[in-house]
């Protein structure tokens, strides 16, 4: 079967890892305390904080359990207590859905204030537009929240690219390293997995997508943490993707 859908990762695939690690993550960490204090009455934030509390209650990590007990011993209020957990999640680089949702809210605030602009790889915009013109369906699957994904493409150095994508998936769909997540995506977009090409800079994610029946491409670039493509076909620029369509 021919490829009709592209399922595309973000970090290390369409934008440099450095933009996420040196701009987005530090901005969210720096703004965490003030955002929680300023928006604690917002319903969306309350829902995120409740989810974080559920995650914390079920977190088996010894360090997390110690933190939980320490905050109780200090009689911290809810906001100050949950902030401690978010800071812990950030420091251990946990792929927490509640944290990702909160970061999306903080980044939304930053984009709106003009304090953040997304930086993509030089060829990304033209490649996305070219594939869109070819009537390929473009979807995003990233560990960042769907809100964060849309913000990133809405506020790029090349303008608003959000309209080029048909579907958005994050960790609410499932872990990116689990085959079931990709099967769920194929079902969601009503497409045979063999017609979907997944592009990522992570070998384990490519393994999981491949196990679901999807075609895969491994994004191998300087600066990407994972430099081992395993058995997956390699691209060094998004322009290389066309060879496999």
UniProtKB/Swiss-Prot annotation:
Keywords in alphabetical order: Amino-acid biosynthesis, Hydrolase, Magnesium, Metal-binding, Methionine biosynthesis
InterPro entries: Enolase-ppase_E1, HAD-like_sf, HAD_sf
Cofactor mode of binding and number, as noted: Binds 1 Mg(2+) ion per subunit.
EC numbers on record: 3.1.3.77
Catalysis: reaction(s): 5-methylsulfanyl-2,3-dioxopentyl phosphate + H2O = 1,2-dihydroxy-5-(methylsulfanyl)pent-1-en-3-one + phosphate
Cofactor(s) the protein needs: Mg(2+)
Molecular function in Gene Ontology: 2,3-diketo-5-methylthiopentyl-1-phosphate enolase activity; 2-hydroxy-3-keto-5-methylthiopentenyl-1-phosphate phosphatase activity; acireductone synthase activity; magnesium ion binding
Pathway info: Amino-acid biosynthesis; L-methionine biosynthesis via salvage pathway; L-methionine from S-methyl-5-thio-alpha-D-ribose 1-phosphate: step 3/6; Amino-acid biosynthesis; L-methionine biosynthesis via salvage pathway; L-methionine from S-methyl-5-thio-alpha-D-ribose 1-phosphate: step 4/6
Enzyme class: hydrolase
Domain of life according to the entry: Bacteria
GO biological process, one term: L-methionine salvage from methylthioadenosine
Reported function: Bifunctional enzyme that catalyzes the enolization of 2,3-diketo-5-methylthiopentyl-1-phosphate (DK-MTP-1-P) into the intermediate 2-hydroxy-3-keto-5-methylthiopentenyl-1-phosphate (HK-MTPenyl-1-P), which is then dephosphorylated to form the acireductone 1,2-dihydroxy-3-keto-5-methylthiopentene (DHK-MTPene).
Similarity comment: Belongs to the HAD-like hydrolase superfamily. MasA/MtnC family.
Self-association state and partner proteins as the record states: Monomer.
Name of the protein described by the UniProt record: Enolase-phosphatase E1
């Amino acid at each position: 079967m021919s490829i009709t859908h592209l399922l595309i990762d973000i970090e290390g695939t369409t934008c440099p890892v450095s933009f996420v690690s040196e701009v987005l993550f530090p901005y969210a960490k720096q703004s965490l305390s003030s955002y929680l204090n300023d928006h604690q009455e917002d319903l969306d934030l309350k829902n995120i904080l409740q989810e974080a509390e559920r995650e914390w209650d079920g977190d088996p990590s010894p360090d997390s359990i110690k933190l939980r007990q320490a905050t109780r011993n200090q009689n911290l209020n809810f906001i100050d207590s949950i902030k401690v957990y978010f800071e812990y999640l950030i420091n251990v680089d946990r792929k927490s859905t509640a944290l990702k949702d909160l970061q999306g809210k903080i980044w939304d605030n930053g984009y709106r204030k003009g304090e953040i602009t997304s930086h993509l790889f030089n060829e990304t915009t033209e490649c996305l537009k070219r594939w869109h013109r070819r009537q390929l369906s473009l979807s995003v699957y990233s560990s960042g929240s769907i809100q964060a994904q849309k913000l990133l493409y809405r506020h790029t150095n090349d303008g608003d690219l959000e309209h080029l994508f048909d579907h958005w998936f994050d960790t609410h769909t499932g872990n990116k390293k689990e085959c079931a997540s990709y099967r769920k995506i194929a079902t969601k977009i009503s497409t045979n997995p063999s017609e979907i090409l997944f592009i990522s800079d992570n070998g384990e994610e490519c393994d999981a997508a491949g196990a679901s029946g999807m075609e895969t491409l491994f994004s191998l670039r300087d600066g990407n943490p994972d430099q081992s493509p395993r058995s997956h076909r390699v691209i060094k620029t998004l322009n290389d993707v066309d060879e496999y369509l």
